[in-house]
From Swiss-Prot:
Coiled coil: none annotated. Pfam families: YcgL. It comes from Xanthomonas oryzae pv. oryzae (strain KACC10331 / KXO85). The lineage of its organism: Bacteria, Pseudomonadati, Pseudomonadota, Gammaproteobacteria, Lysobacterales. SUPFAM superfamilies: YcgL-like. It comes from the Bacteria. PANTHER family: PROTEIN YCGL (PTHR38109:SF1). InterPro entries: YcgL-like_sf, YcgL_dom. Residues 1-83 form the YcgL domain. This is YcgL domain-containing protein XOO0464.
Length: 86
């Protein structure tokens, strides 16, 4: 399985993986409105052995098969003093 990865031009560190190159038709309108425009980054073969920096390959493959896209959001950063510890 191949994925086509696009970077949001509006939201830093936000990427969309598509099952078909340039086919944003399966991406919800709300998501497109918040993240578009997109720029193509790369094509990647999603083999079980493949490692991705911030996503699990099996999860990405499942989402592409079901929905035609996978949305990778930036990791949440927690700064010291922002968490309550019991």
């Amino acid at each position: 399985m191949h994925a086509y990865v696009y970077k949001s031009q509006r939201k830093q560190d936000t990427f969309v993986y598509l099952a078909t190159r340039d086919d944003f038709s399966g991406l919800p309108a709300e998501v497109q409105a918040q993240l578009a425009p997109f720029s193509f980054v790369l094509e990647v073969a999603l083999t079980p052995e493949r490692r991705l920096a911030q996503a699990d390959v099996a999860t990405v493959r499942e989402a592409l098969g079901k929905h035609g896209f996978y949305l990778q959001l930036p990791k949440t950063r927690v700064l010291a003093g922002e968490c309550d510890y019991d």
